[in-house]
Amino acid sequence: MLVPKRVKHRREFRGKMRGYAKGGDTVSFGEYGLQATTSHWITNRQIEAARIAMTRYMKRNGQVWIKIFPHKSYTAKAIGVRMGSGKGAPEGWVAPVKRGVVMFELGGVDEATAREALRLASHKLPVKTKFVKRGEA
């Protein structure tokens, strides 16, 4: 599971998710990629589930690059607690993904295998995605 080794502040503001990605919008490591077409928070569990779905389908052939990292903490109050009395305890970690970001990349496999592996991974994610090739995105 992806989590930061250490952070300066345990609790963060939620922030805004407006506009397109400023960087990370091209396929740079592999030959094929999975690009987000909507913006959303992606948890470390969702990233891991997508990674497992891809590697199981590819049967350990090829290579997978994960280009997003869950560096932002999110908080939640316990069930049944009344409003007020401070911010809740840190609950987990998320990667804020804007539209246009290439989240996963694959290499060393043919296009049909890559397309199916990334399709399976996309079902584990809360964003709409599209398949991109190197040089296109």
UniProtKB/Swiss-Prot annotation:
One of its GO terms (molecular function) is tRNA binding. It comes from the Bacteria. Signal peptide: none annotated. The keyword Membrane does not apply. It holds the Pfam family Ribosomal_L16. NCBIfam families: rplP_bact. This is Large ribosomal subunit protein uL16. The gene is rplP.
